[in-house]
């Protein structure tokens, strides 16, 4: 990986994280029961990553080098900082486009359940250390 790509990911990721923070702060007073800001980040991020994937595939606006830079800055960087859920959603889309419906369903189930179990496990491991 080149230094330029690393910098692009870092710059994009920083701006994505700031955007996520701003959105969660802006929506914090709207709902106390659900994390509306994160929900919106996941939905908006998924919409944008789908649009960017199609745009970079279908248009010839950028040459291959520029397209790579745009992808690392905006998709890997910005959307990675804004939400990692968007990458998960793009992976599901790719599986569905290849006709791998059952693999996509399994991937969704395993990802969500394993992540939930990991969060619970991590939480209780640390809570056990501090008790």
Where are each of the predicted segments found?
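Membrane-interface helix-loop junctions in multi-pass transporters/channels
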Residues: 1-131
């Amino acid at each position: 990986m080149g230094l330029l790509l690393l910098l692009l990911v870092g710059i994009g990721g920083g701006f994505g994280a700031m955007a996520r923070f701003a959105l969660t702060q802006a929506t914090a007073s709207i709902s106390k029961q659900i994390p509306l800001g994160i929900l919106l980040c996941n939905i908006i991020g998924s919409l944008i990553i789908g649009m960017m994937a199609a745009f970079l595939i279908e248009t010839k606006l950028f040459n291959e080098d520029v397209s790579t830079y745009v992808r690392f800055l905006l998709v890997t960087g910005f959307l990675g900082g804004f939400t990692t859920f968007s990458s998960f959603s793009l992976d599901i889309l790719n599986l569905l486009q290849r006709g791998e419906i059952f693999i996509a369903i399994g991937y969704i189930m395993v990802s969500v359940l394993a992540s939930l179990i990991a969060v619970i496990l991590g939480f209780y491991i640390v809570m056990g250390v501090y008790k």
